[in-house]
Regions:
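Extracytoplasmic small-molecule ligand-binding "clamshell" domains
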Residues: 23-95, 104, 257
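Ligand-binding cleft/hinge of the Venus flytrap
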Residues: 45-47, 59-67, 131, 135, ...
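Short helix-initiation/N-cap motifs at beta->coil->alpha
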Residues: 56-57, 71-82, 126-127, 161-177, ...
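Extended ligand-binding regions for polar small-molecule ligands
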Residues: 57-65, 125, 133, 137-138, ...
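A conserved helix-loop-strand patch within extracytoplasmic ligand-binding domains
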Residues: 68, 96-98, 102, 109-157
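Ligand-binding clefts/hinges and TM-proximal coupling segments of bilobed small-molecule sensing domains
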Residues: 69, 146-160, 200-202, 233-262
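A ligand-binding cleft/hinge motif common to bilobed small-molecule-binding domains
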Residues: 79-82, 96-104, 153, 179-214
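Periplasmic-binding protein-like
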Residues: 113-121, 193-235, 257-262
């Protein structure tokens, strides 16, 4: 009898917890989004505090589609995942590559763009890029990224300069603190190579795709583990803005090619 009562009590307790959880489940009428403040043309913050860029427009389009009131929160790259899991915001829209390592810490939306990585150096400095060509050279790459892992695993005879932000790859390169940069092909083309600072530079070697959307990678929006209702809403909204042309209009505002990659 004691066992039966205990089992019944446990069942009632479990049902109570489940009911409470359902009652407390967020409806996502308000969403806080972590974004980066210095990664043009994907995101940047003006002196007046207003954000702009591809990621920003995509985030706003997702919010409009699901009829949510969204607040953008500026966050340094290295603190993105810790801040997400500390509930500083509810999701990250910051050109974050989907990797197996990151999927241990967060859930991701479907990929919303997918572009290769590129080598950037002084024009004409390298006919090809490989471990032999870069032996003894200093490679600049953003830390805590698939690109950093790729460089550290495949260019062991090169010196590696790890920087905090993607924008710092080309900034450090232009300042003469490295021989070659490894970063976003699109960011290099759309921003740095069109700037006065990038006039003497060019993409060199062959672009490399690291775990693209076809392999379950690409770039996604990160959410806390278990926030399935938010992920479902975001994925549905992403499909909707792709189908209704909103995504294309945002894409064409910033880029000459389709970066959806799907």
């Amino acid at each position: 009898m004691i066992r039966q009562l205990t089992a019944a009590a446990l069942l009632l307790a479990a049902l109570g917890v489940q009911t409470a959880a359902l009652a407390q489940a967020p409806d996502w009428a308000k969403i806080r989004i972590g974004v980066e403040a210095n990664y043009p043309p994907f995101s940047q913050m003006a002196p007046d505090g207003k954000f702009s860029g591809f990621d920003i427009d995509i985030a706003n389009a997702i919010c409009a589609q699901i009829k949510a009131e969204c607040t953008l929160v500026s966050q340094e790259w290295d603190g993105m995942m810790p801040a997400l899991n500390a509930k500083k915001f509810d999701m990250i829209v910051a050109s974050m590559s989907i990797t197996e390592e990151r999927k241990k810490a967060a859930d991701f939306s479907d990929s919303y763009y997918d572009i290769p990585s590129a080598w950037i150096a002084k024009a004409g400095s390298y006919k090809e890029v490989n471990a032999a060509a870069l032996k003894g050279k200093k490679i600049i790459v953003t830390r805590n990224t698939p690109r950093a892992k790729f460089v550290q695993e495949n260019f062991k005879d090169s010196e590696v300069l790890l920087v905090a932000k993607e924008a710092e790859v080309t900034m450090e390169l232009a300042a003469g603190r490295g021989d070659i940069g490894f970063g976003s092909s699109l960011a290099a083309t759309a921003a740095f190579l069109k700037s006065p600072e990038g006039k003497a530079y060019a993409k060199v070697g062959t672009p490399i795709t690291l775990g693209g959307a076809a392999q379950g990678g690409g770039v996604g929006m990160a959410m806390r583990k278990g926030e399935d209702s938010l992920r479902t809403k975001v994925n549905a909204a992403l499909k909707a803005i792709t189908a209704n042309g909103v995504y294309k209009s945002i894409n064409d505002k910033y880029f000459d090619v389709n970066i959806r990659g799907l």
